[in-house]
Swiss-Prot record:
Signal peptide: none annotated. This is HTH-type transcriptional regulator MalT. Keywords: Activator, ATP-binding, Carbohydrate metabolism, DNA-binding, Nucleotide-binding, Transcription, Transcription regulation. Residues 829-894 form the HTH luxR-type domain. Monomer in solution. Oligomerizes to an active state in the presence of the positive effectors ATP and maltotriose. The gene is malT. Residues 853-872 bind DNA. It holds the Pfam family GerE. One of its GO terms (molecular function) is DNA-binding transcription factor activity. GO terms for biological process: positive regulation of carbohydrate metabolic process; positive regulation of DNA-templated transcription. It comes from Enterobacter sp. (strain 638). Belongs to the MalT family. ATP binds at residues 39-46. The keyword Transmembrane helix does not apply.
């Protein structure tokens, strides 16, 4: 819940001096990206900007305090201020910040700017007291904000110092409007106006000018002169003499003598106690100070000019001038040291009564009251956890003694979930084990079930499926149906374990159950996770169309619940890219992988490994080895600088091994094989993939017998577990083995099975990456004209893809080849006496590669009619009448020249 006063522009007071000369300068603020108002405390920054903002409707105001260094809190208030300025225009950004569904502040701002692109009126965002921000993450994010904000948005920043926002760059580009302390200082005319509206009897212009010069136009000093003169009924020049040459760092003594010592004891107590509140209203004042009418007392203090300012138009919320508030809090530490804990307790109780647990925790911590802090956490901690107030929760839990956590084991559970969210898996188990060991009395079965559900999640995350399954099953036995969150966790873990074991049908059913429960209770991240798992399972079973449809539902969930910036979005984009790649929709696959990289841009680079492997895979399918090598360089760098799940390593190794196969790099392949551990089993698609990598390297090295043993065992497991996509991949690799070993009949047998299975999986690119060897076999099958219609159609499609992306296949008919061919002793006499032109040789090569007339015309960039002429000429010279005859003739020439076709 947001405190309204932090989003309210200060009310313009009746007795303030209108700074006409500065307002004139600020009138052109909409022409700048940043308006920066800097000066020490007390120069009137906030008052000036509140005057300038008066009458502007498309303006949001955000008043900072020390607590805004938490990135989640900063994001919440900043988006709320924008919503205030735009009358709720940025709905998606608001939902994302409320649900903490963004990867970083910068990515949240990127979404904000997408929505603001449809906002065409001038827009202003004021951030007051920016000097309180010390978090470098926020500074960096605000630099991003300034670089990318829409042209019609002006950011107005008020600060006591130059903020770390890339000011120099903005200044050079003339995108910065600056107002500093020299300009903020009152001139003689403004000082005269100030005294005229503050003092009962006017003073001479010469005297007001002298007073102004004595304090160098410092607004706070002028206010103190007027206040002292009123309270002590003394001449203004006496106060001026005392203030002459003074600055903010030496102001404390003056404020004690001239302000605190000049008010009655009750007012002094009121000022000191209320200063502990960062913002205040009637209810808070009544509870903290004991006043009967807090609102009336606040208004009275305001009338006395004691540096109290209204924070909203309704006059409900107030705050002290920052300079005076800081002074009062310091005095409070000295004068009310023994009362402070009780005052903070009262403040915490009042904030709780008004529904602001975060503020209540702030005061409970300041009071050092562990019992109060415990009670607040017991009632509100899970709500704060679900809103990602993780830093505040960690600080709070650290402040509680261990005994208090043991007496309230749900707080132990909360601390453990905090550790789990930060991937501190070993600490989770240590904490829970210690708690169980030291807890007095028998643990409640439901709580024990919650402990075990969390332990199960930790175990599966840590790569221990056996332990994860054991704990998940115990948890499901212990947890009542009403304990939906932990039951969702345990069910999800059980489904994931079965996935790892290759029990795909049962895993799919459990993941569908998880999705239903998660949707029913709005636990959207588990709903998304379960749908991603369903898609992976369906893909492994060979049901790629069903996997696609599940992905579509998952993308819709992401859109509906604004989950675009969760890391799981990248997971979905990645498996979509894998599916698109399988279907040879390479441009879409690459786009999806790049989108995945963008989603992870705010995370460690190592997280991008899988998407990077997919980019390599797309380049390999296109035959673009240079681009593949560029991506591989980065991928191998990431591999050497991180620890990864075996599935991630397997996917990265897959593209490396295929690349080595394509360029014939046996040395790298052999080194990899020596260093790569062999998985113990092959009962899921993760392990099948790594064994396939091993077999591919063995084939490359000519070790056909061990490779055949591996692939036959993989096929046996794949058939048994119904891992149909893996079976399809295994058959293609076995085909390569048989072909290279000279076992052509076996090669054709497994290729026919792979083609038939591809009618279910839709695989195209898995055939394409095998290159010319695959193309030669497919040409032979097509020439035999014995394939079933669907298989024939797929074979032709695969051949077209190979021809399109592996253009070097027709390089046999280049000039050097033709020159050697014509001098070959066995060259047909017809070719020797009636040689083809270079262009006709190119056309023959493309015909052999399976190109249609239109494709040949496109490849050679000539008209289709020209190609027909070339074909007619070369048919005549070769003595053939049909296209198939030309293909066979080209094949004979290649065999004669020693090419295996």
């Amino acid at each position: 819940m947001l405190i309204p006063s932090k989003l309210s522009r200060p009310v313009r007071l009746d007795h303030t001096v209108v700074r006409e000369r500065l307002l004139a300068k600020l009138s052109g603020a909409n022409n700048f990206r940043l308006a920066l108002i800097t000066s020490p405390a007390g120069y009137g920054k906030t008052t000036l900007i509140s005057q300038w903002a008066s009458g502007k409707s498309d303006l949001g105001w955000y008043s900072l305090d020390e607590g805004d260094n938490q990135t989640e809190r900063f994001a919440s208030y900043l988006i709320a201020a924008i919503q205030q300025a735009t009358n709720g225009h940025c709905v998606t950004s608001e939902i994302m910040v409320q649900k903490r569904q963004y990867a970083s502040l910068s990515s949240l701002f990127a979404q904000l700017f997408i929505e603001l692109a449809e906002w065409h009126r001038p827009l202003y965002l004021v951030i007051d007291d920016y000097h309180l921000i010390t978090n470098p993450v926020i500074h960096e994010s605000m630099r991003f904000f300034l670089r990318h904000q829409p042209e019609n948005l002006t950011l107005v920043v008020l600060s006591r110092n130059l903020p770390q926002l890339g000011i120099a760059n903005l200044r050079v580009r003339d995108q910065l409007l600056e107002v500093g302390s020299q300009q903020l200082s009152f001139n003689h005319q403004e000082a005269k106006q100030f005294f005229d509206c503050r003092l009962s009897s006017p003073i001479e212009a010469a005297e007001s000018s002298r007073l102004c010069d004595d304090v160098a136009g410092w607004a706070t000093a002028l206010q103190l002169i007027a206040l002292s003169a009123r309270q002590n009924n003394s001449p203004t020049h006496q106060s001026a003499r005392r203030l002459s040459g003074i600055n903010a760092s030496h102001l404390s003594d003056y404020l004690v003598d001239e302000v605190l010592d000049s008010v009655d004891p009750a007012t002094r107590q009121f000022l000191l106690k209320s200063s502990l509140l960062r913002s205040m209203n009637d209810a808070l004042i009544v509870r903290v100070t004991g006043e009967d009418n807090g609102q009336m007392r606040l208004e009275e203090i305001e009338r006395q000019g004691l540096f109290l300012q209204r924070m909203d138009d309704s006059g409900e919320w107030f705050s002290f001038h920052p300079l005076f508030g800081s002074f009062l809090r310091q005095r409070c530490q000295w004068e009310l040291a023994t009362e402070l804990p009780e005052v903070h307790r009262s403040a915490a109780e009042s904030w709780m009564a008004q529904g602001f647990p975060s503020e209540a925790i702030h005061h409970a911590l300041a009071a050092g009251d562990a019992n109060m802090l415990r009670d607040i956490l017991l009632n509100h901690a899970w709500g704060l956890f679900n809103h990602s107030e993780l830093t505040l929760l960690e600080e709070s839990l650290r402040a509680l003694p261990w005994e208090s956590l043991l007496e309230n084991p749900r707080l132990v559970l909360l601390q453990a979930w905090l550790m789990q969210s930060q991937h501190r898996y070993s600490e989770v188990n240590m904490l829970l084990a210690r708690a169980e060991q030291e807890m007095k009395g028998e643990m409640d079965p439901t709580l024990h079930g919650e402990f075990n559900a969390l332990r199960a999640q930790v175990a599966i995350n840590d790569g221990d499926p056996e332990e994860a399954e054991r704990l998940a099953m115990i948890a499901l036995d212990e947890l009542p149906l009403a304990n939906f969150y932990s039951r969702i966790v345990a069910t999800s873990v059980h489904g994931e374990v079965l996935h790892c074991k290759g029990d795909l049908s049962r895993s799919l059913a459990l993941m569908q159950q998880t999705e239903q429960m998660a949707r029913r209770h709005d636990i959207w991240h588990y709903a998304l996770w379960s749908m991603i798992q369903q898609s992976e399972i369906l893909f492994a079973q060979g049901f790629l169309q069903a996997a696609w449809e599940t992905q579509e539902k998952a993308f819709q969930l992401i859109h509906d619940q604004h989950l675009e910036q969760l890391p799981m979005h990248e997971f979905l984009l990645r498996i979509r890219a894998q599916l698109l790649w399988a279907w040879s929709r390479l441009d879409e696959a690459e786009s999806s992988a790049r989108h995945g990289v963008e989603v992870l841009s705010a995370f460690q680079p190592q997280q991008q490994l899988q998407c990077l492997a997919l980019l390599v895979q797309c380049s390999l399918a296109r035959g673009d080895l240079d681009n593949a090598r560029n991506h591989l360089n980065r991928l191998e760098n990431l591999l050497g600088n991180g620890q990864y799940h075996s599935d991630w390593v397997s996917n990265a190794d897959k593209v490396r091994v295929i690349y080595w196969q394509m360029i014939g790099d046996k040395k790298s392949a052999a080194n990899w094989l020596r260093q790569t551990p062999k998985p113990e089993f092959a009962n899921n698609h993760f392990l099948q993939s790594q064994w396939r990598n091993i077999a591919r390297v063995q084939i490359l090295l000519g070790d056909f017998d061990p490779a055949e043993i591996v692939l036959e065992e993989l096929n046996e497991n794949a058939r048994s577990l119904r891992l149909m996509s893996d079976l399809n991949r295994n058959l293609l690799l076995l085909n390569q083995l048989y072909w290279q070993a000279g076992r052509k009949n076996d090669a054709q047998r497994v290729l026919l099975e792979a083609l038939q299975l591809a009618n279910r999986t839709g695989f195209i690119s898995h055939f394409v990456i095998e290159g010319e060897v695959m193309a030669q076999q497919l040409r032979q099958l097509i020439q035999l004209n014995t394939l079933p219609e669907l298989d024939q159609h797929r074979a032709q499609r695969i051949l077209r893809e190979i021809n399109q992306h592996h253009r070097h296949k027709f390089a046999h008919f280049d000039e050097n080849f033709v020159e050697r061919l014509l001098t070959h002793p066995e060259v047909p006499e017809l070719i020797r006496t009636s040689p083809l032109t270079q262009r006709e040789w190119q056309v023959l090569g493309l015909i052999y590669s399976g190109y249609s007339n239109e494709q040949i015309a496109g490849e050679l960039a000539v008209a289709a009619t020209t190609i027909k002429t070339h074909i007619r000429n070369l048919y005549q010279k070769l003595g053939v009448a049909h296209r198939q005859d030309a293909v066979q003739h080209a094949q004979q020439l290649l065999k004669m020249m020693g090419y295996g076709v």
